[in-house]
Every structure is written in C-alpha cells, then in structure tokens.
Amino acid sequence: MKKRIKELTDLLNRYRYDYYTKDAPSVSDSDYDKLYRELVTLEQSYPEYVLQDSPTQQVGGTILKGFEKYRHQYPLFSLQDAFSREELDAFDKRVKAEFPNATYLAELKIDGLSISLSYENGFLQVGATRGDGNIGENITENIKKIKDIPYQLSEPLTITVRGEAYMSRQSFKAINEARQENGETEFANPRNAAAGTLRQLDTSVVAKRQLATFLYQEASPTARNQQNEVLAELADLGFSVNPYYQLTSSMDEIWDFIKTIEAKRDQLAYDIDGVVIKVNSLAMQEELGFTVKAPRWAIAYKFPAEEKEAEILSVDWTVGRTGVVTPTANLTPVQLAGTTVSRATLHNVDYIAEKDIRIGDTVIVYKAGDIIPAVLNVVMSKRNQQEVMLIPKLCPSCGSELVHFEDEVALRCINPLCPSLIQRSLEHFASRDAMNITGLGPAIVEKLFLAGFVHDVADIYQLTKEDFMQLDGIKEKSADKLLAAIEASKSNSAEKLLFGLGIRHIGSKVSRLILEVYGDISALLTAKEEEIARIDGLGSTIAQSLTQYFEQKTAAILVDELKTAGVNMHYSGQKVNSDAALFGLTVVLTGKLNQLNRNEAKDKLEALGAKVTGSVSKKTDLVIAGSDAGSKLEKAKSLGIRIEDEDWLRQL
C-alpha cells in the first residue's frame, strides 16, 4: 500500500503541474478524479503512509484561530509609480546614466495581493502576506489551498519567491452571484475578494474560492543572471508565471507594449492595473540598489484611472487626527471601477479654489490610486448659476477659529481639546496598523469619549469592564473581548506605539527608522532635532515634527502613563549604533572587491551605520572603490567626494 500511495501521489502531482502550470492537461477530469478518490481511500486506511506533498493535503479545510505575525527575511519594497511616458523616459535616463547598455523586462502588474513563499529543501514552509514590507502575516494554511502553488518544487531548493495572489473575473462573478442569492454583501472587486479570502480563518472557504497566482521574483540569492531567466526558472520549478512580458532596451518598444496590453486589458481573465518595468540584469539591479521605499531598478506604470461624471449635492467638512479639516463631496451615485461611489474627496480649500468647484456642479470623478474616490475637475459646459462655495471659518466640531498657514494647503483646527480631533486620534491609536485593538472601532470610541471615559490614548488602558458595560449595545462577552484586546496591545512592538501616537509626518516605516537608532520611546523625550535629522531616510521636517511633539509637557506625562500601564516602549529589533564610525553617511560601492563579496561589504557598512546606495550624487558622503571601478568613481572625483578602498573598509 505504501508503494501505491507514493505512485498515486507522484502521478497526481504531475497531472496538477501539467494542468495549472503548463496549461496543458495530460489527463481527463474523470480519470484524475478516479485516481484522486483512490488515493483518498488508501490514505484513510493507512494514515501512517500519507506523504507530505500529497494533493489531498492541499484541499479540505480547518478553522484557524488567527494569523501570527511573520518577519520577512527579505523585505518587500513598494515600487515607484509612473503615470506618463515622460516619467518612464526619466527613469530610463537615470538607469542609462549608470548602465548605457541596460535592457528592461516589462511585466504585467497584476491587481492582486503580494505574497511571499518560502521553501526548504523543496517543500513549502511559509506563505505570508506583504504587510508593511518587513512584517506580514503567516497565512501558510490558506496558501496551501491555492491549487497552482506547488507544495513541493520540482527540485529540492531552499528558496524564497514573490508573486501576486488574485481572483479571476469568472470566479469573482460566480462568488458574487452566490452571495447575492444568500443575501450577503457582494465584494466590490476581485482584489477585495482575494484579500478577504486570504484572511479567512476557515481554510475550506479559501479552497472553494479558487484563487490563483503569478510568481515573478526570487527574493533569496539566485544563480540566475537576468530577470527573464528568473521567470523561466520559476516556471520550471512548478510556479505559474504570467506569459505576457517584453524584453528590450528601447523605451519606445516598452511604450508600444504598454499600449498593446492596455488595449487588451478587458480581454484578460484577471484584473491588471499597469505594467512593471525592471532592469533585466540582476547585477545591475544590485548596483542600482534601493531608496528608502523602492528599488531604483524598477518602476510601475499605472494605467489611467476610469472617470465618470457626477453631480455635487453637498459638501461635508470633517476634522482629522492632526486637526486638518477635509472637504468631502456628496454625489449622485455612479459606478466606478467596480464600486458604487456617492462620496469623493475634494482634498483641501486650495484645491477647491484652484478648480473653482461649486455645489451643484457636474464634476469628473475618478479613483486616486484606484482606491480613493476624488473629484478631478468641473465640467464647465454643464454649469448653470451655481454660487461660489462658502469655506468654513469655524471648526465644524468645536467651533474654534480655523487657521490656514501660509505653507499649507489645508484648513486646520489647532484646538487640542477639539472633540473630533481627540476621537480621530483615539481611532488611529486603536487601528490595525497602529496598536491593533480589535473591536475598538469608531463607534465604540465615540461612545467612550461622549461618556467621558477617555480623553487621550493612555485612558484606554484604564478602562474597566464596568465602563464598557455602561455603553449602549455592549454586553459582558463583548466587554471581555475588548479588555482582552487592550491587554494584548500592551505587548505590541514599540514602532506600532510610536505610529499610534499620531505625530505628524511619523508613519509606520519612519517609526521603525527612529527606533532603530533610539531603541526606546522614552529616549525621544530628550532627542535633539539635529540628531534625528541625520537618520537615514528622515530629514529636517520629520525631525522638527518629532521634537516639537516630545518637547510638550503633555508628551512626558503621556509616555509615563503608558509605561505605568505596562505598554511596551522598547524596540525589539536590531538597534543602529549612533556612535558607529559611519553613522549617517551615504556610501556607494563600486568596482570589483577582492576579499569581500558585495553583500559582505554592504552588511559591514550598514553595521557601521552607513546607508548603502547604488548611485553617486551630491548627497553621497563616501565611495568605496574596488578594482576596475568605472563611471561612479569618475563622478565621485568630479564631485570631490571622499574615496576609500577595500583595505580601508576591512580595517574598520
């Protein structure tokens, strides 16, 4: 029986590979089902012989308790966006300045969810979401339910690969039809449906919804030299690889490819929202390196957003957590990019004045970044006698006088006791990307605030079961869950807490960069603006905002209250030594190194506090030049930049 189970497992896995990866079925569905049923029967009778890569282990379902956080060994960076031919030409110019003979590979930008798959000796170990690029969620059990993801590779490799999980238009249509029949809310678009599916706790639901994938990157070190070779290897290993791509050195040919794909976009079985252009040489990619947010060797051209006409019925003014007052237009409903849109942002008062937007106007509405509905401009030919919009002088929440600073485009309420400002700050603190206090959403925050139970974020940690029980609609079980979520948030990473404080210009990535240097939020109470500005990726604006916040007496009180409540203040990641020899310096490696390989040299520089970049500019502080150094060395000399060799680096 053991031998037969092995035969069936190997045979069925080969059939799955032919069907899902090669798109060339080598057996009829009925024959496959017959063999599959035989394997199921044998495995039920002899469970001790069930193999790790059995296809039966990738179907069925279990109920998961939740998803654990997963720190990516290789960070997932965002891509720089481009919306015009001019931006692509500028990218081409930057690359060709370093590598005149560079070629590009243009690939489809799948409108799905980024995933990372890690294999050990050929077997799938971890499937994870992108998250913030450094920390995602471990969704391995759900990943196993996606039929075109191989549980075992065709070779016993230890490798980490990247790609997109998506839902086909056909599957999306079928799911929404079923949800409509069951009286359930329909998904807005395939991307939302795929996102909701990957976060399902019931893995059988994932299996039924028939997600699919396209893989496009080997994140771990590879023996391949070119990106097109990587795609070929991924296909050989058993992954699904998108068949549409263009290899060329000409931006004219790239543009022709983009226009060809855009024209057939609606004919594809899945949604795409652009084309990604990558430098094809992996060695050149390594030389070009990364900015804080994105690789310098790739750019994502985004297709123009769909636009529709709608009438502005009224305008609401709302106060955000930093006091910014944002205008939102209420519209006649329109279908836009798969969703019904009845509200759209007007951005700020300067935008309203610039576009001369008035209530009653017919306007062009689009989705900024394919996500946020926004008003593009007014259809002047349809304007009648609309009056100029009245801009509020007083805060719609607290009645305080609004200010419009010269260097800002927004109206701002500067009353620290403004109810809306406080509520938005509390909501932000409890949000998923900040302290992730499950259940503590806007409705409950509002009830707590109006009841007088919370006035700042530290008050959240003083709440009792009796406090929650006094709120309308909160029962004992809900109160217990909320208290448990609050307690659990105390052990969150310190960067989540710093982000949760809602300091202007301090996002989640900036929070991590700051704490890599300072190590503890308490240390920020005495941090100097000039020190913060030296941190790679920050600058004077962020430094000023951070120091202004922590110089307030209320900040010291808040930090003390949070610490007393047991909230984690300490950064658990690897701390950067601000006393390191090269701290704050921007360094470029060029030429051939004799003793160290490039990764070893980069690791050493970063350990010494340096930021390693791929190109020489006026911002470069130091160039480490090996043998056969070319244009980068010459440019460094022309700019008067300090130059050292490999021996100097090794002695540090």
Swiss-Prot record:
- Supply the gene name: ligA
Q: Name all BRCT domain ranges.
A: 577-652
Instruction: List keywords of the entry alphabetically.
Output: DNA damage, DNA repair, DNA replication, Ligase, Magnesium, Manganese, Metal-binding, NAD, Zinc
Name by which UniProt lists this protein: DNA ligase
Q: Which HAMAP family match?
A: DNA_ligase_A
Stated EC number for the protein is 6.5.1.2
What does UniProt give as GO cellular component?
Answer: cytosol
Gene3D superfamilies xref list: 5' to 3' exonuclease, C-terminal subdomain (1.10.150.20), 6.20.10.30, BRCT domain (3.40.50.10190), DNA ligase/mRNA capping enzyme (3.30.470.30), Helix hairpin bin (1.10.287.610), Nucleic acid-binding proteins (2.40.50.140)
The entry's NAD(+)-binding residues are D29, S30, D31, Y32, D33, S78, L79, E107, R130, E164, K278, K302
Function, as annotated = DNA ligase that catalyzes the formation of phosphodiester linkages between 5'-phosphoryl and 3'-hydroxyl groups in double-stranded DNA using NAD as a coenzyme and as the energy source for the reaction. It is essential for DNA replication and repair of damaged DNA.
Q: Which CDD domains is this protein grouped with?
A: BRCT_DNA_ligase_like (cd17748), LIGANc (cd00114)
Q: Which InterPro entries match?
A: BRCT_dom (IPR001357), BRCT_dom_sf (IPR036420), DisA/LigA_HHH (IPR041663), DNA_ligase (IPR001679), DNA_ligase_AS (IPR018239), DNA_ligase_CS (IPR033136), DNAligase_adenylation (IPR013839), DNAligase_N (IPR013840)
**Binding of Zn(2+): at which residues?**
C395, C398, C413, C418
Q: Which residues of this protein are catalytic?
A: K109
Q: Which Pfam families match?
A: BRCT (PF00533), DNA_ligase_aden (PF01653), DNA_ligase_OB (PF03120), DNA_ligase_ZBD (PF03119), HHH_2 (PF12826), HHH_5 (PF14520)
What reaction gets catalysed by this protein? NAD(+) + (deoxyribonucleotide)n-3'-hydroxyl + 5'-phospho-(deoxyribonucleotide)m = (deoxyribonucleotide)n+m + AMP + beta-nicotinamide D-nucleotide
GO BP terms in the entry: DNA repair; DNA replication
Record GO terms (molecular function): DNA binding; DNA ligase (NAD+) activity; metal ion binding
Q: Which residues cross the membrane?
A: none
Q: Which family does it belong to?
A: Belongs to the NAD-dependent DNA ligase family. LigA subfamily.
Instruction: Name the needed cofactors.
Output: Mg(2+); Mn(2+)
